[in-house]
């Protein structure tokens, strides 16, 4: 009673953000962050609810919005009931003497549904909704009357299968009621904040069958993003609203969906069939992109305490005939210079008060095969006929490299990747000398992984190797073609770097940033997260039966053979030309929108002089990035104290203390200078190169060679910037 007399929202936040975490820890269940479950701020909830109320009136002729008879609502991921509470409050705010009306009583207790999997928020939701009604003078009800069911939304089986602990005796009754909602009730509105979890454990046959429409026709190497829980929840809602219980093939069901979710589906290349399905199912779609990813602008705050970007999406089906393709309306906070959480909440509050027209929506023009739900302007159509670095599964167009793959994937980077060779040897010695229990406790690895790695080590079927871990950051791993603590060794591609002289190119499939700097040369095996997300590697040569052959597709070899310039060029010269293009600022800017959609493409239809100039500059860049060029520059170590103490430790500093007055501060005794802001901020992929190198070595005692590598890295970056300026003149 004491709790219920306190402010409703603060109680709910406390229970959901603190008690629920402790409860889950106690039960040893999956952590909230892994499951993607977070309390939804009220500004978000109220904006979605008010927008749906508006659309009910303007699009579905429900003049009273949620108050209208026959408007049945489901929150498919109820949590502590914030969305349903907002619906309750919306209904109450529009009714005088609300509880004297039996129809309104039925609205609360018969037309509003919720599904929740976790016990604690399920209880909190009932308490919250009960308190709202009691505060408004209605007491003739029980919390048990609410249609909120302890249930997994994605479990669509018609026969119960209870394989989890539940502190309720009437779980069977709960399940039957939820099943009735899923399979029998017609809903008009589905809303909520579904969990985001890329490693989804929801693998029921029914939901996977429904999900096939989002995967149909895809031949991408990795469609794992489509298995995220939030994607499954969206597919469930689409099916429930528009497809389930159709009387006949020609019936067009109507309704609304309103969610806040991970925003990966609006511009993910793998999500193109999902977007196509939504586009062809609804009449109108509204996408409010709130951004907030740690890969977005540095000052772009998330509306949640998470690192993935989010968006609000509203889906509307109101016409009597099948959709001919939705009108898609888009608004981006980033494009409108709205970056702080406070500003984003203010925008949402404005929409809540003034309606959807408070936003200046931009109608998108969607094209096959991608159906982007974001603003994209493709002006330079000639790019589409260039040669892709690798095979583009979406468009199946001409490509250069035959053998390529994403880089190595470890089971745990902090174990499988070490800063120096000795540290890697120490890990392997532990695997050999410690007991099973000691190893599992120290390294938190499954014992089978430890045994596999140890077997490879003792049988000499693996070896300690350098690895291109991050840009200009070569570290160490234990490599074997079989799985150990390298979960995916990518041997088919990586074998061509093992004890063999080779060059390779690291690149990405599409940029997730508003810039492109995602390519670098390599000469060793590479990490799969090289640029901060999925990264690919293509060797220049393949070693087949002791023969060294160029790693080019048959189509590109035929093109090369008949090309007036390429026919006389070596694979190295072609790589140099490619590399110069990828580092050309003008190329990066001109084709940025295309570089966000697929593997980078290269134009070989150039004049002889242009090719030769680019190949010359590209060769310099390749040698530079492999640290094979001698650089004479004023950048050097400087001592910060008169005693000139030789201190090789990288002290842990905040960025404001790390880079001061054109100096990189390594510790209280040593710095590198002069370093311009341009050098310090130089970025490859998702990493600020120098900053990231230092971050991996906080509180680490460097060798002299490691510090010399850092010094040379600064010089390499400076010269790279100079060469890029030369390229920009073309």
Could you describe each region identified by the protein language model?
Residues 7-288:
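SAM-dependent methyltransferase catalytic region
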Residues 3-11, 225-226, 565-573:
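Structural motif
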Residues 201-206, 210, 220, 238-730:
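Sequence-level detector for compositionally biased, low-complexity segments
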Residues 3-7, 36, 579, 609:
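A general boundary/transition motif marking the beginning of the first structured unit of a protein
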Residues 3-4, 26, 707, 727:
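Extended hydrophobic/Leu-rich segments
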